[in-house]
Amino acid sequence: MIDLKLLREDPDVVRRSQLSRGEDPALVDALLTADTARRTAISTADSLRAEQKAASKSVGGASPEERPALLQRAKDLAEQVKAAEATQSETETAFTAAHMAIPNVILDGVPAGGEDDYAVLDVVGEPRALDNPKDHLELGESLGLIDMARGAKVAGSRFYFLTGQGALLQLGLLQLALRLAVDNGFIPMIPPVLVRPEVMAGTGFLGAHADEVYRLEADDLYLVGTSEVPMAGYHADEIVDLSEGPLRYAGWSSCFRREAGSYGKDTRGIIRVHQFDKVEGFVYCAPADAEAEHQRLLAWQREMLAQIEVPYRVIDVAAGDLGASAARKFDCEAWVPTQGTYRELTSTSNCTTFQARRLATRYRDANGKPQIAATLNGTLGTTRWLVSILENHQQPDGSARVPAALVGFVGTEVLEPKG
C-alpha cells in the first residue's frame, strides 16, 4: 500500500505516478475522499463513546428524579454509538478497498508509458553470426534435454520434462546462482510454494493479474509464481533487525503461473510455461538504502549472466509495465538468435515500502522507533535461461557448448546430439 502521509501531503505525486503507469488518476481522489470519510467516522464514533461513558457515570450519582432522563440519554447514546460504529466499519472497508486499488508510486526517472517504452541502460556482448540457427526446443530435443511431448501427455500444454543433461544443466545453473548468493551474504532458503491469501495479497499479486495465480479452493491456498511471495511473508507482522544492514535471502523453489493472459504467445518450448524453477533474491532494508540495494541486486544478476556467456542488455522498465508493487524495475534480457531479439532472463524490483506496509514488516530506526521497511527482489537464475544458453552456444554440427562455469555440474564441455 502507498504511504498515506505522502498521499495527504502531496497527492499530485501519486496522480503523476498513476498517469505514468497509464492508470486512472481519479483513484487518488477516491482514496482521499475515502480517507476523509474514514477519519470523520472514527472521530464521530470516538466522541460518542466518550459521551456515552460520561453519561453512564452520571447515572450512578444522580438523584431519583434525575435518573430516568439520564438513563434514557445513556440508552439513546448507546444506539448512536452502535450506528456510528457501523458507519465506521463501512468507511474502513471502503477505505481499504480504495487504498489497495492504487499501485506503488514510481520513483523519479522511471520511463513513462507501456511495454515498449523502456530505456536501454547497457548492452553487453555481440550476438554471434549463426547460419540457420536451431531454436532451443529443436536443440533440446536433439540433445536429449527437453521433452515437451511427454510433458503435454502427462500434464497438458506448456508442461515439459527436463531429462538427462538438461536436468543437470538446470540444477547446475541454480546451484551456481545459490553459491553466488551465499558468497554475497544471502541466507539460502527453500520456502513453501503454497501461501495464504493474505500473503499473496500482501505482495501485490491479487490485483489486476489475479487470474494468473493458481488457487487451491478447498484449502484456500495459492501456488506461488515466485519465491518472492513466501519470502515477503517470512517477516510479516514482525520488527526485523536491520542494525547491521540489509537482510538478504535467496529462495530456491518451483514456481507456477497460469499464463492466462498469454494465449498464443510463446507456445513453443520453455520460454513461457506453467511450472519452472528459480532462485530468487529477496532483501529487507531501510528505505534510505533501497536504491543502492537495487543496484547491488542488478550487479549480482549481471555477474550471473557473465557466467553463462551470453549477449544481453539491461533495460529500465516503463511505468506501465511495472507490477503493482514495484516502484522501479530493471530487466536483463539475453539475446535469442532464432527470434532476433532480446528476451527477459532476470528482473529486479524496488518495491520501496509498498509490500512491507501491507504485511506489517517494520524495523527500528536510529532512535528505536518502529518504521516500515523496504523490500526488493531479483532473479538470480531460472529455467528460461536454458533457452539462451542452448541457442547462443550451439555449434554447426548440432552440438552445444556448455559454459565453463557449468561444466563441473553437467560433467561435459559439449552436449552432443543423441542417436
Swiss-Prot record:
Entry-linked InterPro entries: aa-tRNA-synt_IIb, aa-tRNA-synth_II, aa-tRNA-synth_II/BPL/LPL, Ser-tRNA-ligase_type_1, Ser-tRNA-synth_1_N, SerRS_1_N_sf, tRNA-bd_arm
**Positions of the region Disordered?**
45-66
Its pathway? Aminoacyl-tRNA biosynthesis; selenocysteinyl-tRNA(Sec) biosynthesis; L-seryl-tRNA(Sec) from L-serine and tRNA(Sec): step 1/1
Under the heading Pfam families, the entry gives:
Seryl_tRNA_N, tRNA-synt_2b
**For this protein, what is the EC number?**
6.1.1.11
> What are the transmembrane regions?
none
Q: Which chain positions lie within coiled-coil regions?
A: none
Q: Where, subcellularly, is it found?
A: Cytoplasm
Molecular-function GO terms, alphabetical: ATP binding; serine-tRNA ligase activity
Listed binding positions for L-serine are T226, S227, E228, E280, T379
Q: Pull one GO CC term from this UniProt entry.
A: cytoplasm
Q: What does this protein do?
A: Catalyzes the attachment of serine to tRNA(Ser). Is also able to aminoacylate tRNA(Sec) with serine, to form the misacylated tRNA L-seryl-tRNA(Sec), which will be further converted into selenocysteinyl-tRNA(Sec).
The Swiss-Prot or TrEMBL record describes its family as follows: Belongs to the class-II aminoacyl-tRNA synthetase family. Type-1 seryl-tRNA synthetase subfamily.
Task: Quote the subunit structure annotation.
Answer: Homodimer. The tRNA molecule binds across the dimer.
Q: What is this protein called?
A: Serine--tRNA ligase
Q: Which organism is it from?
A: Mycobacterium ulcerans (strain Agy99)
Q: Gene for this protein? A: serS
